[in-house]
Amino acid sequence: MRIFMKSKLLVIATTALLFAACSDSFLDRAPEGNYVDATFYTSDEALEAATAPLYNRAWFDYNQRSIVPIGSGRANDMYSPWNYPQFVTFQVTALDENLSGAWSGFYSVVTMANSVINAVETQTQGSVSEAAKTKAIAEARLMRACAYFYMLRIWGPVILIEDNQKLVDNPVRPLNREEDVFQFIINDLNYAVDNLSEQSDKGRATSWAAKGILAKVYLARSGWNNGGTRDEGDLELARQYASDVCENSGLDLMTNYEDLFKYKNNNNQESLLAMQWVPLGEWYECNTLLSDLAFSTEVTGGVNCWSSYNGSIDMLQQYELADTLRRNATFFTKGSYYSYICIKDGGYTYKGTASPIKKGVPGGPDDDNDGKVKQMNSPLNTYILRLADVYLTYAEACLGNNSTLSDGRGLYFFNRVRERAKINKKSSITLDDIIRERRVEFGMEYSNWYDMVTWFRYLPDKMLNYFNNQWRGYRTDAIIKDEDGKLHFGKYDTDGTTFLEGPEYYTAPEFTINIEAEDIFLPYPESDVIQNPLLNEPPVPYTFNE
């Protein structure tokens, strides 16, 4: 088993130093200067190409499948009794393939980032500029921070790694404390803030992306295991970084929410950081999620798909009556129409009585996708951070330890998100308002669970009560929509025309779901525990080099 672990790390480290394959963005830009040999970089362009896999190959194992049940299923965005229901119902075991896929996927990001940093320090020569070296390290540290921020909110204590060779030499490593994981993330992000530029080639990270993520990290840390209050110092830092992005970046929300999820709007003005997938790309460079998300070939132009996911009862109940733009962009519901799907037929209207996934399903190859749709190959990027996320982070940081927020720029930016959805502004907001707004804004973007864990670490009793009142594992035979657009949940009577509405007509799970504090964080994959028994031991302090 130890030999296998060494081999895997070496493959990951080597892959990080290969050039990414083709696309029409920075990912396929051939370097004007090339290597002295296979591992030495002699130009800025060659070094820039070496960081390109950090935007796709590094994230592939996580994005390939695990991202959906962990990021959205765990949050109860959607449910299927046939597609990884254990994440919704909190029945995940250490043997789960998506669990191990996420663990290995995040460490692919970490070890690939480490490899880039090592290459900059030991494998550059010739005309490579100091600016190019610093930028490459900053991009690598940003991605490493993102990976660890995800891991912290899935497992809590994790293993911090800066030197791949030390891990290869001794793969039995202890877990590190959550407070040290936070500090490691912050150190990486501070470096990225200081050394990335405010503007970059499309798809490349900027200092604004680093600041936005840093704001989220400080907000998360402010209440993490802090006895039900938020640390004012961390709140102030969260406000400062979020405010800087909101007020000074010059970026703005996309006008139309639905446009965020169309292929030709990849790397739009609202996209601060995203996984950059190659349309029609090879394995490890492509977004495989299309077939897992799309419910029928009628919305993929005949491309094979197999999703049985539907929006959960609880998720669909979060949408206000007027919030049809975001609901329709996220889920198909009866009567919802899409002009950009089945274009040659005049558009597509969903006529069913379920709630299949819409977000992540851009249509078929003959729609407005330039032919770049095929089985397990979507042309869409995967968002890591959108500007709307920073807006809501700013609002929550401004709310801080108060029960309500009734004025100021935090409320203004909260309402900017609602204005885009064409729903009424709020004159004051609470944490409950922020929780609901986040859920509908980022539904099926594989991020809601991570925010829920942050709130759980801040207010555990509140969030346990929330989780246990989400109708987890429940489903309905039919969802209908009345003339006002309101959804009704239930089933049709035996006559086929009388609709029976209400919880008594829901289909309940076969077992009682009672979520407790020890259920929130996922187990470490059993295969890794066998390789590294220290995963069963208490975490230890990390020795920082900076």
Curated annotation (Swiss-Prot):
InterPro entries, per the entry: SusD-like_N, SusD_RagB_dom, TPR-like_helical_dom_sf
Keyword Transport attached: no
Keywords: Carbohydrate metabolism, Cell outer membrane, Lipoprotein, Membrane, Palmitate, Signal
Cellular component GO terms held in the UniProt record: cell outer membrane
Compartments reported by the entry: Cell outer membrane
Domain of life of the source: Bacteria
Positions where lipid (N-palmitoyl cysteine) attaches: 22
Membrane topology value: Lipid-anchor
Record-linked PROSITE patterns: PROKAR_LIPOPROTEIN
Main location: membrane
Covalent lipid adducts (S-diacylglycerol cysteine), residues: 22
GO molecular function: polysaccharide binding
Segment forming the signal sequence: 1-21
Example GO BP: xyloglucan catabolic process
Pathway in which the depicted protein is active: Glucan metabolism; xyloglucan degradation
Further comment found in the protein's record: Gut bacteria supply the human body with energy from dietary polysaccharides through glycosidases that are absent in the human genome. Xyloglucans are a ubiquitous family of highly branched plant cell wall polysaccharides present in the vegetables we consume. Enzymes involved in xyloglucan degradation mediate the conversion of otherwise indigestible plant polysaccharides to short-chain fatty acids.
Function in brief: Polysaccharide-binding protein present at the surface of the cell. Probably mediates xyloglucan-binding before xyloglucan transport in the periplasm for degradation.
Homology family: Belongs to the SusD family.
Annotated protein name in UniProt: SusD-like protein BACOVA_02651
Native source organism of the sequence: Bacteroides ovatus (strain ATCC 8483 / DSM 1896 / JCM 5824 / BCRC 10623 / CCUG 4943 / NCTC 11153)
Lineage: Bacteria, Pseudomonadati, Bacteroidota, Bacteroidia, Bacteroidales
